[in-house]
Amino acid sequence: TDEVASVAEALGLAEEEIQATNQPVRVASTGLPVLIVPVATLAALFAARPRYGLLRDLLEGRDATLVYAFTKETKEARSAAHARAFDTVGSVEVPGAGAAAGALAAYLVSHNAVTVQPVTVLPIEQGHAVNRPSTIYTEVHLDSGEITRVVMGARVVRVGEGRLEI
């Protein structure tokens, strides 16, 4: 489709890497709207080279703040997905986007892309491409098949600390 073509071009991917997933490109939100983009393989996800001007154009018409590309192929067997987050600024890839991971978890549950339970726990890997690996732990709570709550928490790499006195 035209949408897949424009998303693939903005991410520097082949269209087939998105089409092969048989999952839709969708805006999802748990407070911060993100464009969820399924990618077939971890190798393709790591090969993505975003074109930030095209990403900006892509997100403007969708009321989304960043692109959250993911694959179900992971580094750790316990993880549900591996993701990369790209904003429109293009300065640095976001290494641990909790709200985006929550949106991805809701997307995976609502599209039956994972085994669904009343409380579905989905660890999401992120940050490996920028040497700041993190695992974002998500829980999607269901009641009568409807998502009622999404909870996120994370284990990240500390890159600095400070103290502020007022």
Predicted features, each with a name:
Residues T1-I166:
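Active-site proximal loop and beta-alpha junction motif in alpha/beta enzyme cores
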